[in-house]
Amino acid sequence: MPTREIRHPLIRHKLGLMRRADISTKNFRELAQEVGALLTYEATQDLPLETYEIDGWCGKVSVEKIAGKKITVVPILRAGIGMLDGVLSLIPGAKVSAVGVARNEETLEAHTYLEKLAPDINQRLALIIDPMLATGGSMVATIDLLKKAGCKEIRAMVLVAAPEGIEVVEKAHPDVKIYTASIDQRLNEHGYIVPGLGDAGDKIFGTKQKDA
């Protein structure tokens, strides 16, 4: 399925603020949550609805609610945590399934070190969140894990994506929809997205930042 780059004016504006080299941890964290919420709006537009009846102030009223599968949000640790509150602000009833993936800085290969999945994940729509889709290794490893656990419907939301990472994910899992605020130019020799956001995890948690 093709990757969707969401070019909404609010998203473009907020993403531009996030690219500043001198952005504070507080502002970066708040913007990551806000863009995460806006991406959630786009990624859930096709959820099915069903009609039911309630007692309104003027009598019986027909209203709608989301039908079908329940949702689990899957932050890829650690940086994915930075988008979590924004997503949950729109779908507060969603379960959270955390996945820890580490990348070898020399080989750029990803390995999973933690998985805490919703027990009924095979009955849920999984929304993976991670600020960066760089090489694609962490995303593929997470999708592999979810599918092994029985999850049949998976979508991914990232703030910025590199064409190389998109290609890797689409080749490995063509059934997974990817929603991103920006498809950036490329990866550099260190596997960082250009122009990117820098090290999103460091900026969210206030730890040492790397040039990227």
Curated annotation (Swiss-Prot):
Q: Which SUPFAM superfamilies match?
A: PRTase-like (SSF53271)
**What are the recorded GO MF terms, alphabetically?**
GTP binding; magnesium ion binding; uracil phosphoribosyltransferase activity
Q: Which positions bind uracil?
A: I193, G198, D199, A200
- Textual note on the cofactor: Binds 1 Mg(2+) ion per subunit. The magnesium is bound as Mg-PRPP.
Annotated control of activity: Allosterically activated by GTP.
Its required cofactor(s), as named, are: Mg(2+)
Task: Kindly name one Pfam family recorded for this protein.
Answer: UPRTase
List positions binding 5-phospho-alpha-D-ribose 1-diphosphate: R78, R103, D130, P131, M132, L133, A134, T135, G136, G137, S138, D199
Q: In which pathway does it act?
A: Pyrimidine metabolism; UMP biosynthesis via salvage pathway; UMP from uracil: step 1/1
Catalysed transformations (reactions) = UMP + diphosphate = 5-phospho-alpha-D-ribose 1-diphosphate + uracil
The alphabetized UniProt keywords are: Allosteric enzyme, Glycosyltransferase, GTP-binding, Magnesium, Nucleotide-binding, Transferase
- Gene Ontology BP annotations: UMP salvage; uracil salvage
Q: What is its EC number?
A: 2.4.2.9
Task: Give the family from UniProt.
Answer: Belongs to the UPRTase family.
The free-text function statement in the UniProt record for this protein reads: Catalyzes the conversion of uracil and 5-phospho-alpha-D-ribose 1-diphosphate (PRPP) to UMP and diphosphate.
Q: What is this protein called?
A: Uracil phosphoribosyltransferase
Q: Which organism is it from?
A: Pseudomonas putida (strain ATCC 47054 / DSM 6125 / CFBP 8728 / NCIMB 11950 / KT2440)
Top-down, what is the taxonomic lineage of the species of origin? Bacteria, Pseudomonadati, Pseudomonadota, Gammaproteobacteria, Pseudomonadales
